[in-house]
Swiss-Prot record:
Segments traversing the membrane: 7-26
Chief place where the protein resides: plastid
Annotated protein name in UniProt: Photosystem I reaction center subunit XII
Organism of derivation: Porphyra purpurea (Red seaweed)
GO annotation terms (biological process): photosynthesis
UniProt entry keywords in alphabetical sequence: Chloroplast, Membrane, Photosynthesis, Photosystem I, Plastid, Thylakoid, Transmembrane, Transmembrane helix
Taxonomic placement: Eukaryota, Rhodophyta, Bangiophyceae, Bangiales, Bangiaceae
GO cellular component: chloroplast thylakoid membrane; photosystem I
Similarity-based family: Belongs to the PsaM family.
Length: 30
């Protein structure tokens, strides 16, 4: 079974990783 808390943690992790990837990409393009 998948808990609502597990879904929330997965979404939060995906959001953080996306933000880090965007920041890293911007630094590389400068």
């Amino acid at each position: 079974m998948i808990d609502d808390s597990q879904i929330f943690v997965a979404l939060l992790f995906a959001l953080v990783s996306a933000v880090l990837a965007i920041r890293l990409g911007k630094e590389l393009y400068q």
